[in-house]
């Protein structure tokens, strides 16, 4: 483990990467993203397999509440077939929430555990990696295009980006620039909002952990209540960020699907 404060922080902000530069693959992000997905699938498949028509267990009740809540949000905001959008929204919320929740694990626990197996760098929160949030947002971007074409056709898509908001051929270049910027802003804002909040949360946990390294006992003792308070507040943050990512995805797809009505 790193010695000085600067080395400690730098160590915790370094990825387990394969390759260099733009083409570097963050293996820790991939691993924990897949792990979060496996946890989600395991819990929900187990509940589905053990579902009963009688008195349900606590886990089944919780899962049914979450499913009903997400389905209600989709029903209120997406005015079209929900057979794909509702499961997509549920997957996004649960997957992002689980990835966010990894941030609640003490900052030194997983890196030290990995160090025992010869892995010297490890960042366990996938959503604190811009490559992960951009990857999810790019998927949403292509879904926006898909639902726009599905509702209006390819010709309608071209018309939307050339004759809106100014319905005259003279303004085609202006319309195209305005609509393209608006379209690209959606996935970019999705990615950076989630990344920014989770990166900041991870960094605050690291800075609080630095207090335990101080020579002053009072400063070390102060780190305990600060850690507890921030962890409790962070539960709200990780839930809210998962909700926002899911909700904006629903809204963006709803706008794309219902453009024909505008």
Curated annotation (Swiss-Prot):
GO MF: proton-transporting ATP synthase activity, rotational mechanism
What is one cellular component GO term in this UniProt entry?
Answer: plasma membrane
The record's subcellular location field reads: Cell inner membrane
Q: Which UniProt keywords apply?
A: ATP synthesis, Cell inner membrane, Cell membrane, CF(0), Hydrogen ion transport, Ion transport, Membrane, Transmembrane, Transmembrane helix, Transport
List the membrane topology term(s).
Multi-pass membrane protein
Kindly state the subunit structure of this protein: F-type ATPases have 2 components, CF(1) - the catalytic core - and CF(0) - the membrane proton channel. CF(1) has five subunits: alpha(3), beta(3), gamma(1), delta(1), epsilon(1). CF(0) has three main subunits: a(1), b(2) and c(9-12). The alpha and beta chains form an alternating ring which encloses part of the gamma chain. CF(1) is attached to CF(0) by a central stalk formed by the gamma and epsilon chains, while a peripheral stalk is formed by the delta and b chains.
Q: What does this protein do?
A: Key component of the proton channel; it plays a direct role in the translocation of protons across the membrane.
Q: What is this protein called?
A: ATP synthase subunit a
- Please name the source species: Actinobacillus pleuropneumoniae serotype 7 (strain AP76)
């Amino acid at each position: 483990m790193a010695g000085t404060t600067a080395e400690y922080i730098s160590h915790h902000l370094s990825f387990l990467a394969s390759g260099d530069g733009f083409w570097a693959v963050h293996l820790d992000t991939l691993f924990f993203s897949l792990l979060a997905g496996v946890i989600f699938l395991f819990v929900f498949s187990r509940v589905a397999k053990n579902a009963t028509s009688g008195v349900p267990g606590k886990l089944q009740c919780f899962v049914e509440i979450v499913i009903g809540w997400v389905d209600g949000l989709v029903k209120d905001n997406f005015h079209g077939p929900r057979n794909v959008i509702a499961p997509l929204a549920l997957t996004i919320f649960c997957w992002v929430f689980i990835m966010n929740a990894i941030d609640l694990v003490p900052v030194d626990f997983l890196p030290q555990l990995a160090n025992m197996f010869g892995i010297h760098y490890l960042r366990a929160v996938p959503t604190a990696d811009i490559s992960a949030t951009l990857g999810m947002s790019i998927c949403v971007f292509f879904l926006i295009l898909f639902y726009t074409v599905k509702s209006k056709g390819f010709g309608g898509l071209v018309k939307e980006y050339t004759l809106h908001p100014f319905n005259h051929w003279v303004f085609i270049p202006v319309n195209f620039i305005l609509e393209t910027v608006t379209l690209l802003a959606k996935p970019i804002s999705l990615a950076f909002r989630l990344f920014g909040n989770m990166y900041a949360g991870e960094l605050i946990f690291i800075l609080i952990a630095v207090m335990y390294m101080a020579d002053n006992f009072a400063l070390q003792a102060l780190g305990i209540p600060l850690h507890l308070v921030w962890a409790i507040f962070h539960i709200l943050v990780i839930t809210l960020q998962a909700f926002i990512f899911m909700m904006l995805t629903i809204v963006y797809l709803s706008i794309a699907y219902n453009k024909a009505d505008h």
